[in-house]
Amino acid sequence: MNLNDRVEGIGNERSIVAKSTERKNKIPPSLKLSPVESVGEKSPTPATVYDLFKKYHKSDSVKPTEEDNMNVGFDKLSTDEKNGFLRKLQMLTVGSKKSSKVDESTPSPANRLLKKIVPSRRTSTEHPNSSNRMHIFGSSRTTKKSIDSERNSQRKKSARRLNFERDAEQKKDSTKTNNSSFVAEMTREYEKIVISKGAPVPINKANRNLYRNPRGSLETPTDSPQKGFSSSTESSPSDSMNQFPSREHFTSANEESPMKRKNFQQEHGNKNRDSDATWFGELPPRDYTSPTFSRKIFVGGVPWDITEAALKDSFGEFGSCAVEWPGQEARYRSGQSNLAPSNGSLRAQTKYTGQAATGYVYMIFEDERAVASLLHECSQEIGGAGEWYFKIRAQRSKSTEIRQVQIIPWVTSDSMFCEDDTLLETGIEPKRTVFVGALHGMMTAQVLHSIMEDCFGAVECVQLDTDKFKYPIGSGRVTFREHGAYFKAIEMGYLHVYTSKFRKRVQIDPFLESTCCMVCNSQSAHCFCRNKNCFKYYCHNCWALDHGKDDDQEVHIPVIVPSSASKAFPGATTRRSQVSSSLSLKNGSNNSQVNNSIPHFPSAGFPIIVGAPAQTLSALYGYIQNGQQLLKPAVFEPPMTPSPSEINKNRRSFTEFSTPPTVFFNSTPVISPQKSVSDGSPLPAYYNSAAFLTPPPTYYGSPNHPTSSNISQPQQPYYGANLYYGFIPPQQHPSAMMRSPNYGQ
C-alpha cells in the first residue's frame, strides 16, 4: 500500500469519525405541532426540543459530554421550573411521537434525560426488553390491557394528552355521580336527625312533585278540603295545604325568611297563627258580552320622568281625562305640598313636581265609553287575564320615544260574586266573614272566590271594596258557608297567591262588628282576641281580668273593635278633625236640626253609617247600587249588623222611595291601605272613611211622613269595620266620642 492509499484511508476514517460525531451531535428535526388544548394551556412556544432545552439552559452549566449529549443543568432549576419544563416537554414529545417517523427503539437525548429524571415504573409481568421507552406519555402498542389497568391511573390520565377530553368527561361524570350519591346520603342522614328532634326540614328548592294535583283550576275540585275544623296547632288547617311547598322556596334575597319570622313569633309568644297557606294556579281569560267599565284605569310601565301633559296627550284622543298620581294625588295636584326631599334626588323630586316616579299612574275619563274606545286600540295577549297594552309617546330632549304600557281596566260586575242571588235579600252572616287585604288589581271577585274555596272551604259571597269610580282599592270581604272554613282562614292569617302574572301575600283578618262583651254581656266590646283559645269580644274590665295572669305563656294581642276605638283612646283635636268641623259648618241650615244629633265628620278610626237600607246596603257590606250617587272621598265603608240594643222597628227602609237615596261622604281626605297619609303626619296610612245615608229631600215632604223638624228620635247608626284591625289612631275627634250612641254605657 503506497503512501497515497494510506492518506486516503486516513481521510476516509476521519470522515467516518466526523460523520459519526455529527450524527451523535445532530439536533432533532423541527416539530410541526398543532396547538393542544390541555388544562387551559396551549403548546409551548418553542418549536423544537432543542429550543426548549436552550430556553432552560444555564450559563454556568457543564458542557455536553459523550455520555450525556445534552446537559442543561436540570438540577439547578427550581421546582416550578422543573414542573413547567417537564409539562412542556411532554407536549413536544407527544407531538413528535405522532409526527416524526423516527424508530422508537432509537433513544433520543430527551428520552435519556427523562429516563434519568422520571424512571419508568415497570411491573414484574412486563417484558424487560420492551421497546416502548415512552410509555409514561402514551399507551404502549405492545403492552397488554391488564398491565395498563395496573398502572397509576392519575399519572396515565395526566400524560395521555391525545385522549384528554374523553378522560376529562369520564372523570367529570364519575365525580358528579359520587357527589350526588354523597349528597343524597347526607340528606337522608340529616332528615333522620331532624325528624327525631321534631323540627321542620328547610328545603331551599321548590319540589314541584310535592303538589302533583295543584289547585290551579278556578273550578271547584272534586277533592275539596275537609270542612271540619281542628283546634290543634300541629294539624294543618286544610289537608290540601300539605301538597304545597313552604314559603322558603320563593324567598328572595331582600325578603325576610319565614323561619326567622316564625322564631320571632315563638319568642314573643304569638302562636295565634299557623304557617301561611299557598295557592298555585293561573287566572282564567275574561270574556264579557256587554261589560260596563269603570271610568278609572291602571296604567303600568310608564317612564318615571313622564309628565302629566304627555299622558293627557296620549290618552286625550279618546276623551277628556285626568291623571291620578300614586300616593296622595290630591295633595300633589293641588300644590299643598310642593316641598322636595332634602336629598335632591331627581327621582324623588319628580313625585312632588307632578311626575310618575313609581312607574304607574291612574287615568280617569269623564265617560266609560272612552275606556271602551281605548281598549279597541289596545293589543291583548291570547288568553289574557284582563291586561291590555297601549303605546304612548314620551318626549325626550332630542327625540320622541314610543313606550308600550300596560292597561288594566275594571268591569264593575267583577266587584261582587255570590253563588245565590237570594243573599241580596236575606243578608250575610258577619260571624262567617273575613277581611282580605293586599289584593292584586287583576283579582276579580270570582277569582278570589275560587281561590278561597280551594284553600279553606265553601264560600257564599265575595265583595271587593271600590272607590267612587268603582275601581278596586285592594281589599274585600269573603263570607264562608260554614264556620269550619272561617276558622281555618282566620288561623292561617295569610295566603300566598302565585300565578304567572303576579305573586301576592293576601292578608286575612276577622271582620269585626259592634257588639257587647261576651263575658259580662253588659258593657260594649272594646277589643277582640283572635287567639283560638279565646276568640271572643272583651270590654276593658273583662280583658284585664282574663288576660292579666302572669302564668299565661301565650301573648294574646287585642284587636280593637272600631266602634270603641274613640272611647278607649281619646285625644286632642287634630288638624284633620278641625278641618272636618269647619267643613261641617258649611252645610245648609235646612238639615241643621237633624244633623246636630249625629256627628257628620267623625274621626277616621270611628266610621259610622246612619240610616242604611236594611235589605240592600246593610245586607252586602254596603254595596253601592248603580242608581245611587257617590260623593268623595273615594272609599265607601260597608255597614255592618246593628248593635243588639237596636230594634228592627226603629230601622228606616228606603226601598219604598221612588228616588234613590243621596249618599254623603266625609270630605276629609281618606286613604286606602295602598296609599299614604295625606296631611303629612307620621301616622300609619290605614284609615276608614265615614259615610251617611239620609233620605232624599222629597221624603219628609210627602203626606205620609212628617217633616225633619218633627222627628223626635235620631236615626239609628250602623258601624263599619276597620280596614286594618289593631290600628288605633292616637288622636280622636272628641265630638265623635261624645255623640257615639254607645258612649256612656
From Swiss-Prot:
Residue spans of biased composition, Polar residues class: 219-229, 241-255
Protein biosynthesis is among the record's keywords: no
Positions of the RRM domain: 297-319
Lineage: superkingdom: Eukaryota
Disulphide bonds in the chain: none
SUPFAM superfamilies the record matches: RNA-binding domain, RBD
Biased amino acid composition, Basic and acidic residues: 162-175, 264-276
Region (Disordered): 1-45, 94-180, 204-283
Name recorded for this polypeptide: Cytoplasmic polyadenylation element-binding protein 3
A GO BP annotation: negative regulation of cytoplasmic translation
GO MF annotation list: mRNA 3'-UTR binding; mRNA regulatory element binding translation repressor activity; ribosome binding; translation factor activity, RNA binding
Annotated Low complexity bias: 230-240
Organism: Caenorhabditis elegans
Coiled coil: none
